[in-house]
Every structure is written in C-alpha cells, then in structure tokens.
C-alpha cells in the first residue's frame, strides 16, 4: 500500500509541470466588451472578439532574440491582474491626468514573459525579458487575421523610409496589392 502511494506521488510529480498551465486562456476588458483568447500550444496565438463578434482569429506571434524564438516553448505559469490607476501627464495636455484601466494576463516562460492587456477600447501585448544577459532582437513575427474583409486605411509605399506625406488608400483588406509595403499605423473599420 505504501509503495503504491509513493509510486503515485512520483508519477504525479513528474507529470505535474506538463499539466499545470492551461493551453487556452481568456481575458476580458473591464467593461466586458472585448475578449481575448490566448492559445499557448506550440506557438502563442490570440483571437479577439468585441461584443461577441470575432474581430481577429488565431493571430500567431513570436520574437526572435539572439538564437532563441520566444513564444514557441512551453509556458510555465499564468498570472492575472486588474489595474485601474490615475496617471499624471508630464507634458501638459488638455487634461492633467488619465485613468489607465485594463485586465492583464501574463504568460511566464524560462527567460521572458508575454503580457497581454485588455482595455475597453483595444488590446496590447509585449514581450519582456527576465534574463540578466542582453541579446539583440532579430525579428518580430505577428499576423493579423481578420474574420471578415473589413475596410482599411493603409499607407502603401514602395520603400520603408517614409515621411507620411502620401494619401492613405481606403480599400477592403483583400483588395490591397500583395506586392507592396504598408507602414504603421493602419486603421481597420470593424
């Protein structure tokens, strides 16, 4: 009986890391209108819904730092927090302060973490290094997969250096030319 109990504990201890972190994580905005669904199986990806309508569908993201690709290994831990704090502007604006209000999901990995923030009017993510050594960022990979063919306001250009003096092209996403560059920001009507 004691041997079976010890074998059970050993088996559970070895299996524990692989079953502790959920592969699908959801978080909503403070007003519950925006919902982000994060998948952590093999590669981090996210989907976004607003008022129950899917806006972005399974958008993978990763960051190549040194020789490592962040966002493709196993997530060790997931933490959550809600933030509502006043932020004072250093540079004078129309208002003296604003409220920073969001819900955050943090995916913790060996040498980095990925923070997703869900605001009432949008979402954001960022990669944060937790390692002591500094390595260069070589590449960021992200795709925006819209559920429908929405109208976009896009600054199309044939070069990456730009002074933002051209007109924006207003077209459905699928009508944009595949062989041209676009620079941020791009606005999409949903």
Where are these regions (language model features)?
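Bacterial Sec-dependent N-terminal signal peptides
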Residues: 1-24
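N-terminal accessory beta-strand-rich subdomains and adjacent acidic, glycine-rich linkers
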Residues: 24-190
């Amino acid at each position: 009986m004691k041997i079976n109990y010890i074998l059970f504990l050993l088996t559970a201890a070895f299996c524990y890391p692989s079953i502790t972190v959920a592969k699908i994580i959801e978080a909503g905005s403070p007003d519950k209108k925006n919902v982000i669904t994060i998948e952590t199986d093999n590669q981090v990806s996210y989907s976004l819904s607003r008022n129950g309508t899917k806006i972005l569908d399974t958008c993978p993201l990763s960051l190549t730092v040194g020789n490592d690709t962040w966002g493709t290994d196993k997530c060790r831990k997931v933490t959550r927090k809600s933030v509502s704090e006043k932020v004072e502007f250093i540079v004078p604006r129309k208002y003296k302060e604003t409220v920073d209000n969001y819900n955050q999901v943090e995916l913790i990995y060996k040498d980095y973490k990925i923070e997703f923030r869900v605001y009432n009017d949008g979402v954001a993510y960022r990669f944060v290094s937790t390692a002591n050594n500094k390595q260069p960022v070589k590449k960021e990979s992200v795709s925006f997969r819209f559920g429908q063919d929405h109208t976009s306001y896009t600054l199309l250009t044939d070069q990456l250096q730009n002074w933002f003096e051209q007109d924006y092209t207003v077209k459905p996403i699928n009508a944009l030319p595949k062989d041209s560059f676009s620079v941020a920001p791009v606005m999409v009507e949903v």
